[in-house]
């Protein structure tokens, strides 16, 4: 970046104007059926010369949609020699730019620009490649309100070199020319809906640049009987190889001309040719006709994103593996078979390297009218809560700075595979989107907490901009502490149901204190109870040397067990007076059967009480209904009697009328 006292930041696409020698010689608007323009593509020298000319020109043309902060001056590129982009993402940002000169404007002033290296550094927020894919799917899911019915994630091929590329396509509302510039720029976001996942207007850039060095976008939009289509290119390869010191985004805009029956360009001739020349040099398509053919399967509205020059891992293999499983996309080298087969095959283990598994739990709710199609096959939606045994529903009302947030319902239970799996964690969603999958809130070395999984939607905490974590706030810390408590409380109350035995910890021997002669022993005050063991036996119940207040303790409204368990939840070896400790896992013991039977009876009793309450409510409703019917019946009786009186009166009138006629 270069700057001085006068700072001018432009978020719109800025297109470098080629030198005279690189300008196309002819121009005319063409429809989709035309062959379009083409440029020489034979050698790296041609590619470099055009790029250098575009980068080192003395003038620039700002894209058609301007903002008050548009940089209306010229641009110059760095004097650094073009260098190929390293194909490994985590090394692609380490090139020497010390020779880069400051961007000079004709009036002698320096302006603040976004350097191409920001594309790479901005994308490093995505440590996990699937997190970047999820960001792109969020854009499609946000389009459900505009009629989107599907999003496609698939492998495609770069026609220029045959290399693998990633395709993401949806049939949402699409983007008009202005929206395309906001998408390619920084800091624009028009997602004001409370249900929208996107917020910062940065996700498209971070996610696409994390998956590959270059991305080309095709979008068609229809509004007020106006049909437009736009093509935009964000190319890290182009910017670095041509030595640009600012981000340059070529964009082509077309509008359908109903009278001519074809698409016409919206930009002026010079601007259009400048943008087209860059697109044909650095995109996967070498002619305008090939570019326009990409709209053939888009339909009247929708967006197609193609990410190419995809990043390699440290073994020089594609970071995303498209070949191992025909209907899935894997992260190369991330499959680790460390545990038993049942653990390795579980969704909590596979989501980290299988995109199909991750997408199945990515959204808490998906409309039946919307489909996620991965490699040609629909992703089946999976609700983790459906995998739980003995589920409990715990209410939690977060509070911070004296204000109360919305009530949160947490579903918690044992995995169906428990106790054979050593998995644990909470799937925490925000506005329907999974932010933290299987978040482990406790560290367990023994059995405590194993197999306990929960699901909740925490809209009261804000996710980080990469949507893979939450901002570290007081609310998040309180939530984490409460989830720790829930885990231990649930485990302590229900572990016998999956085959664990709970034993009381051996009691400590506390000698009886002898009162000094002449001193009267003090008794505890009313409302307190102190228990002291006698003798040397260790089989007596656990004792407490602290007085216990017999007053009912103030419980948290969503508490399900004693508050004593809340003292040291994170420590696996903690003991609490009067509470149980899990010692070992056993099969077939008499005490285990007894405990399980007791818990089952308690659950059955709870169900019966719920049924009784339900029937009582239904009985009351029926009584009210009966009273209403009786009241209506009385009204009908009164009406009937009134009508009978009127009928009798009419009969009398008729009789009198007949007599008068006869006489």
Swiss-Prot record:
It comes from the Eukaryota. Stimulated by DMS3. Its EC number is 3.6.-.-. This is Protein MICRORCHIDIA 6. InterPro entries: HATPase_C_sf, MORC_ATPase, Morc_S5. GO terms for biological process: defense response; DNA repair; gene silencing by siRNA-directed DNA methylation; positive regulation of defense response to oomycetes; regulation of DNA repair; regulation of gene silencing by regulatory ncRNA. GO terms for molecular function: ATP binding; ATP hydrolysis activity; DNA binding; endonuclease activity; protein homodimerization activity; RNA binding. Gene3D superfamilies: Histidine kinase-like ATPase, C-terminal domain. The gene is MORC6. Keywords: ATP-binding, Chromatin regulator, Coiled coil, DNA damage, DNA repair, DNA-binding, Endonuclease, Hydrolase, Nuclease, Nucleotide-binding, Nucleus, Plant defense, RNA-binding, RNA-mediated gene silencing. Residues 49-62 have a biased composition (Polar residues). Residues 1-77 are annotated as: Disordered. It comes from Arabidopsis thaliana. Residues 614-659 form a coiled coil. Homodimer and heterodimers with MORC1/CRT1 and MORC2. Interacts directly with SUVH9. Component of an RNA-directed DNA methylation (RdDM) complex that contains at least MORC6, MORC1/CRT1, MORC2, SWI3D and SUVH9. Stimulated by interaction with DMS3. Interacts with IDN2, SWI3B, SWI3C and SWI3D. Pfam families: HATPase_c_3, Morc6_S5. Belongs to the MORC ATPase protein family. Its main location: nucleus. It is found in: Nucleus. GO terms for cellular component: chloroplast envelope; nucleus; plasmodesma.
């Amino acid at each position: 970046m270069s700057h001085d006292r006068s700072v001018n930041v432009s978020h719109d696409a800025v297109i470098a104007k080629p030198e005279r020698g690189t300008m196309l010689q002819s121009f005319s608007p063409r429809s989709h059926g035309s062959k379009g323009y083409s440029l020489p593509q034979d050698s790296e020298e041609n590619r470099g010369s055009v790029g250098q000319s575009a980068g080192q020109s003395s003038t620039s043309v700002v894209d058609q949609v301007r903002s008050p902060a548009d940089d209306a001056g010229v641009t110059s590129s760095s004097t650094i020699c073009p260098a190929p982009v390293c194909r490994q993402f985590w090394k692609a940002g380490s090139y020497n730019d010390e020779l880069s000169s400051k961007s000079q404007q004709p009036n002698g002033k320096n302006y603040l620009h976004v350097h191409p290296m920001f594309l790479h550094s901005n994308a490093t927020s995505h440590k996990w490649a699937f997190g970047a894919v999820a960001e792109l799917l969020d854009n499609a899911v946000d389009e459900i309100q505009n009629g989107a019915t599907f999003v496609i994630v698939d492998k495609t091929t770069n026609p220029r070199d045959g290399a693998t590329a990633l395709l993401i396509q949806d049939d949402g509302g699409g983007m008009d020319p202005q929206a395309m510039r906001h998408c390619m720029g920084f800091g624009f976001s028009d997602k004001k809906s409370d249900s929208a996942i996107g917020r910062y207007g940065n996700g498209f850039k971070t996610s696409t640049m994390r998956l590959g060095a270059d991305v080309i976008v095709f979008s068609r939009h229809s509004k007020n009987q106006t049909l437009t289509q736009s093509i935009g290119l964000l190319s890290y390869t182009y910017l670095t190889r041509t030595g640009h010191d600012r981000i340059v985004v070529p964009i082509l805009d077309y509008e359908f001309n109903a009278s001519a029956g074809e698409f016409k360009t919206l930009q002026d001739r010079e601007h259009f040719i400048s943008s087209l020349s860059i697109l044909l040099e650095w995109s996967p398509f070498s002619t305008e006709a090939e570019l326009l053919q990409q709209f053939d399967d888009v339909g009247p509205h929708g967006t197609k994103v193609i990410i190419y020059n995809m990043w390699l891992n440290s073994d020089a293999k594609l970071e995303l593996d498209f070949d191992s499983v025909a209907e899935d996309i894997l992260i190369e080298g991330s499959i680790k078979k460390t545990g038993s087969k049942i653990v390795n095959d579980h969704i909590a283990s596979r989501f980290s390297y299988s995109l199909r598994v991750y997408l199945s739990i990515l959204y808490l709710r998906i409309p039946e009218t919307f489909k996620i199609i991965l490699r040609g096959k629909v992703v089946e939606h999976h609700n983790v809560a459906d995998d739980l045994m003995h589920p409990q529903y715990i209410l939690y009302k977060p509070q911070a700075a004296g204000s109360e947030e919305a009530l949160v319902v947490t579903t918690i239970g044992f995995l169906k595979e428990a106790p054979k799996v050593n998995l644990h964690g909470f799937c925490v969603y925000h506005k329907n989107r999974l932010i933290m999958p299987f978040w482990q809130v406790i560290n367990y070395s023994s059995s405590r907490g194993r197999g306990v999984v929960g699901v909740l939607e925490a809209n009261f905490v804000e996710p980080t901009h990469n949507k893979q974590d939450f901002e570290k706030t007081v609310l998040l810390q309180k939530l984490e502490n409460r989830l720790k408590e829930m885990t231990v409380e649930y485990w302590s109350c229900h572990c016998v149901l999956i085959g664990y035995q709970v034993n009381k910890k051996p009691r400590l021997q506390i000698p009886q204190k002898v009162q000094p002669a002449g001193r009267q022993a003090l008794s505890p005050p009313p409302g307190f109870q102190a228990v002291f063991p006698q003798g040397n036996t260790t089989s007596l119940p656990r004792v407490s040397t602290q007085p216990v207040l017999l007053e009912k303790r103030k419980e948290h409204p969503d508490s399900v067990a004693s508050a004593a368990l809340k003292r040291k939840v994170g420590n696996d070896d903690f003991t609490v007076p009067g509470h149980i400790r899990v010692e070992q896992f056993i099969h077939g013991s008499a005490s285990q059967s007894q405990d399980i039977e007791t818990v089952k009876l308690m659950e059955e009793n709870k169900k019966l009480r719920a049924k009784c309450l339900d029937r009582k409510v239904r009985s009351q409703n029926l009584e009210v209904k009966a009273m209403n019917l009786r009241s209506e019946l009385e009204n009908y009786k009164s009406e009937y009697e009134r009508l009978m009186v009127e009928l009798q009166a009419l009969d009398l009138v008729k009789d009198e009328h007949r007599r008068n006629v006869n006489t």
